[in-house]
Amino acid sequence: MGSRCGRPGGSPVLLLLPLLLPSCPLRSARMFPGNAHGELVTPHWILEGRLWLKVTLEEPILKPDSVLVALEAEGQDLLLELEKKHKLLAPGYTETHYRPDGHPVVLSPNHTDHCQYHGRVRGFRESWVVLSTCSGMSGLIVLSSKVSYYLQPRTPGDTKDFPTHEIFRMEQLFTWRGVQRDKNSQYKAGMASLPHVPQSRVRREARRSPRYLELYIVADHTLFLLQHQNLNHTRQRLLEVANCVDQILRTLDIQLVLTGLEVWTEQDLSRITQDANETLWAFLQWRRGVWARRPHDSTQLLTGRTFQGTTVGLAPVEGICRAESSGGVSTDHSELPIGTAATMAHEIGHSLGLHHDPEGCCVQADAEQGGCVMEAATGHPFPRVFSACSRRQLRTFFRKGGGPCLSNTSAPGLLVLPSRCGNGFLEAGEECDCGSGQKCPDPCCFAHNCSLRAGAQCAHGDCCARCLLKSAGTPCRPAATDCDLPEFCTGTSPYCPADVYLLDGSPCAEGRGYCLDGWCPTLEQQCQQLWGPGSKPAPEPCFQQMNSMGNSQGNCGQDHKGSFLPCAQRDALCGKLLCQGGEPNPLVPHIVTMDSTILLEGREVVCRGAFVLPDSHLDQLDLGLVEPGTGCGPRMVCQDRHCQNATSQELERCLTACHNGGVCNSNRNCHCAAGWAPPFCDKPGLGGSVDSGPAQSANRDAFPLAMLLSFLLPLLPGAGLAWCYYQLPTFCHRRGLCCRRDPLWNRDIPLGSVHPVEFGSIITGEPSPPPPWTSCQQRSHPPSLDLLSDPANSELT
């Protein structure tokens, strides 16, 4: 898709963009067809510097944190430096399957007890490796952008005593699988060599505040059957796919953290059909339940079924972090985990606001290298890198407030166990990590031991500048939308606090909308996203008349059979989006104008809607539907195609606790306005919340000065009166000034001073006349001093 599909405004486009594959057979047995054979090899573990044990097909005896593996490929000895992916599984990681009676069985295995590794090949600077060591070794070994291998175990009947594995050139592998190169094809199909991860990414990733995608993967019942109803095999398949997805997402500086796996061992828990659109939205509806029990960022369904046409994956664009749309579906279409992982990464890319790469956009990898992940159609070899266009779209998505949940792990050490210095990722026990010594120009960090240089406080993060922590209150993430909230450096961490936003239901857009997952959807905004800045919502009678019809011109969505549903009158504003004005054609490709006319007060009124072309090959949700969270009346909001009460008891309770001194954030804490202090906005302070970091005024010295003055100023009148009482009479007589004794208070009052009973009027700006002069024996001062007795010239200080 072109750049016009981007969403400059607020809420996500619920547009489904599938990844297309050629209609050639992709699923096969473990062995390749025909007489295809790779080179027979036996990898060996190397522990404590010596050859230790050959890699067998059994479950590994050891699962070390780091290990060397030796093998030979095409007469060349390769030494793989492998490291267990400690960040792959989150603390609290769970695995769920079901008993025959339908009850779930939830296990909490040790989140470090797995056999998924990554690493590099010693002596090859551009190399990278992604391997599973469960039941032998399988995975990718990339030496350079031109040379890559796939290693996999041989079937048990073929191994006898040795060798235990086969290694293939990737181009061999795909040629044997019957995929022919066709330069004129709309699909990419070429000899495979997978691109390496750019080394420049290492420093970029370390220097920014990290982003983590907390993922929950579900395998449907068909996939479980295809794995011969073997729960452990299904589990390993999902972990291998997740391991590869993580490697792909790292090219976007995003790290995957798996919070859980679920296998539908007895039956599917959401409706799964050959219709990808129907399957997706049924799954997203089911996803709400698991998300409520175990919050995470994205839920991905991996199905063993085949969808109609060439669609192998589907996801809502910009759906990430949203309860109703943060997920996707992918078919397990490839024998290789990398193939299925490329599809899942593509769909996650859509959730992150990425559209299909236009022609000429992918310069990072050509067809022979797999191309780029976000190309609309892909074949063999599978892509492994995101294009520069995708990276730009992602930056735009983050700038406008998208993906706040990806920043909710502000301290990477929370997810880390043993680490390896020099890999470019800040891990447990490291103060910094700028990559290898040859490529580490960082003035803050020692590359050889990942420690800070003398005098340095930090090396990475948005709250680190010139090796020093930014002061508390320095803005590090401004509010991006009406429903977003700013974050500030804490002064103790180099990372910006987790991204928070207004609690769902908070009013936004001057009361025309209500916040939902950090967005502020309004009818005006949605019309302008479809038709341009000159568009506006159609009159309400358009919605009432058209959406009650229950056809393609007006409806409240579709049922599971694809039939249009009419809207009830109260729900009319939550159905088909109807607009007026703007561009003659929609700004989004594959969508056409559908104008309808109604009579309103004796005149014809055009109600403009949008319709997806049936032959567009985009099996997508009707983009012309009003988005969830859109206001549909006073204190009313659209949810599930119904106009519902927007009043939230949770929001009301939170606002009450904030003493009307602030708003409520997504963690249900008070975000105080300037002048009030968290946590409850009931005491003077700078504003902000316990989640955002301490706010700071534009002039960091102004607030302490104001607090000092607010304390001292009330004392000045009393201090002045005391000074007058004790010092001024003596001063007057010494200077020859005449004073008089006040008989009421029995004290001297200097001329021009204020009587205590008149203090209130002085404060309100009403000057009192000075007391009359009295006779003195001497008056040595010239008459010019009489101005002190002139009320018109009196000044109060």
Swiss-Prot record:
Principal location listed in the UniProt entry: membrane
Signal peptide limits: 1-29
Post-translational modification summary for this protein: The precursor is cleaved by a furin endopeptidase.
Membrane topology: Single-pass type I membrane protein
Any one Gene Ontology BP term: regulation of cell population proliferation
Residue positions with a glycan: N110, N232, N277, N408, N449, N645
Domain EGF-like, chain residue ranges per copy: 650-682
Compartment(s) where it occurs, according to its Swiss-Prot or TrEMBL record: Membrane
Molecular function as annotated in GO: metalloendopeptidase activity; zinc ion binding
Disulphide-bonded residues: C321-C405, C361-C389, C362-C372, C476-C496, C654-C664, C658-C670, C672-C681
CDD domains, per database record: ZnMc_adamalysin_II_like (cd04269)
Keyword terms, alphabetized: Cleavage on pair of basic residues, Disulfide bond, EGF-like domain, Glycoprotein, Hydrolase, Membrane, Metal-binding, Metalloprotease, Protease, Signal, Transmembrane, Transmembrane helix, Zinc, Zymogen
Stretches in topological domain Extracellular: 30-702
Domain commentary: The conserved cysteine present in the cysteine-switch motif binds the catalytic zinc ion, thus inhibiting the enzyme. The dissociation of the cysteine from the zinc ion upon the activation-peptide release activates the enzyme.
Protein name in the entry: Disintegrin and metalloproteinase domain-containing protein 33
The species this protein was found in: Mus musculus
